[in-house]
């Protein structure tokens, strides 16, 4: 396995571990999720370039669109929660209440 793939998998693993360790704040969870999406995007782009399959070129672009939508929704949720509660602690939020 080439070194670039190992580095990207290491970046994904570190982001996943960060998501598990720093899950108390919503902002840190969103940053770790963005790191995971970025490493998946780079891996999909490299796989597409190596396979030379024309229809596979849409996969990285679709992942990038979903990552942008996820970031926009996550930041809107963060702003809404911080305006309502004054903090971004995940464990203090009970979103099932009216």
Swiss-Prot record:
Q: Where would you find this protein in the cell? A: Mitochondrion inner membrane
A molecular function (GO) held by this record is: NADH dehydrogenase (ubiquinone) activity
Q: Which InterPro entries match?
A: NADH_UbQ_OxRdtase_chain4L/K, NUOK/Mnh_C1-like
Enzyme class of the recorded protein, top EC level: translocase
From the UniProt record, give one GO term of the biological process aspect.
ATP synthesis coupled electron transport
Transmembrane stretches, by residue range? 1-21, 29-49, 58-78
> Record's GO cellular component, any one?
mitochondrial inner membrane
Catalysed reaction equations from the record: a ubiquinone + NADH + 5 H(+)(in) = a ubiquinol + NAD(+) + 4 H(+)(out)
What is the recorded membrane topology of this protein? Multi-pass membrane protein
> What's the Enzyme Commission number for this chain?
7.1.1.2
**Tell me, what's a Pfam family for it?**
Oxidored_q2
Q: Keywords on this record?
A: Electron transport, Membrane, Mitochondrion, Mitochondrion inner membrane, NAD, Respiratory chain, Translocase, Transmembrane, Transmembrane helix, Transport, Ubiquinone
State what this protein does.
Core subunit of the mitochondrial membrane respiratory chain NADH dehydrogenase (Complex I) which catalyzes electron transfer from NADH through the respiratory chain, using ubiquinone as an electron acceptor. Part of the enzyme membrane arm which is embedded in the lipid bilayer and involved in proton translocation.
Q: Which family does it belong to?
A: Belongs to the complex I subunit 4L family.
Q: How does it assemble?
A: Core subunit of respiratory chain NADH dehydrogenase (Complex I) which is composed of 45 different subunits.
Name of the molecule in the record? NADH-ubiquinone oxidoreductase chain 4L
């Amino acid at each position: 396995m080439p070194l670039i793939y190992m580095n990207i998998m290491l970046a994904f693993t570190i982001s996943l571990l960060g998501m598990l360790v720093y899950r108390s704040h919503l902002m840190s969870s969103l940053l770790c999720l963005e790191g995971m999406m970025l490493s998946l995007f780079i891996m999909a782009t490299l796989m597409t370039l190596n396979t030379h399959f024309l229809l596979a070129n849409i996969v990285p672009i679709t992942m990038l669109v979903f990552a942008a939508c996820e970031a926009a929704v996550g930041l809107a949720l963060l702003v809404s929660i911080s305006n309502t509660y004054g903090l971004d602690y995940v464990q203090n939020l009970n979103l099932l209440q009216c």
